[in-house]
Regions:
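Core beta-strand elements of the Rossmann-like FAD/NAD(P) dinucleotide-binding domain
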Residues: 2-5, 167-175
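N-terminal Rossmann-like FAD-binding beta1-loop-alpha1 element of flavoenzymes
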Residues: 7-31
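Structural detector for helix-capping/boundary residues
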Residues: 12, 149, 174-175
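Residue-level detector of alpha-helix initiation sites
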Residues: 13-14, 36, 127, 184
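Ligand-binding pocket scaffold of soluble enzyme catalytic domains
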Residues: 16, 161, 170
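Conserved N-terminal/central alpha/beta ligand/cofactor-binding core
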Residues: 34-160, 179
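A conserved FAD-binding loop/helix module that cradles the flavin
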Residues: 186-188
């Protein structure tokens, strides 16, 4: 392609798809992902989304639990920011069509997981990641071009990133966003 995309997103999991959806309408987006649409870590995530959405919960309690579970190694202000955004993220995903488990009363069926003093994990059985990816893909249909190819290098010119090299050739962009996950392999 000779004309660059407005943005090239490397990674087709939850982070990359959410970024694609947050771009203004009309933005030319390429999502470059190494695997087929259902591959990667995101669809395999079984747990829930911890968010203070229950009647016995609060953002402050969520942050307190998270900081305690972090055994002193988490940045407290970052924890508070992330916990504060949790309820809005759950609502946003619901507005996109994510189907989370609900009780007989129609309210979210919250699970209590490790480190939580109250039940706060929103889930879809044991396939929460798969459901979130499904909802994001559905909501983003037609918003981005998916390029199924492994990225092998960042393309640089005059001190800035201008795209990515893939196994199938270059993909140029005015901006490049890395949403590749895989941090767990850091220690492998």
């Amino acid at each position: 392609m000779t004309q660059p995309y407005d943005i090239v997103i490397v990674g087709g999991g939850i982070a990359g798809l959410a970024c694609a959806l947050s771009a203004p309408a009309g933005t030319r987006i390429a999502v470059v992902d190494k695997g087929e649409a259902r591959a990667g870590s995101s669809p395999l995530a079984q747990g829930g989304i911890a968010a203070a959405v229950g009647p016995e919960d609060s953002v402050e309690l969520h942050a307190t639990d998270t900081i305690a579970a972090g055994a002193g190694i988490c940045g407290e202000s970052m924890v508070r920011d992330i916990c504060g955004e949790g309820p809005d993220v759950v609502a946003w995903l619901g507005s996109l069509g994510a189907r989370f488990d609900r009780g007989s009363d129609g309210e979210l069926d919250l699970a209590r997981e490790g480190g939580q003093t109250v039940a706060r994990s929103v889930h879809t059985a044991d396939a929460t990641g798969f459901e979130i990816v499904r909802a994001l893909r559905e909501a983003g249909r037609g918003r981005a071009e998916r390029i199924d190819s492994r990225s092998t290098a960042l393309l640089l010119a005059d001190g800035r990133c201008t795209g990515v090299m893939t196994e199938d050739g270059p993909v140029l962009g005015r901006g490049v966003l890395l949403a590749t996950g895989g941090a767990g392999a850091l220690w492998a």
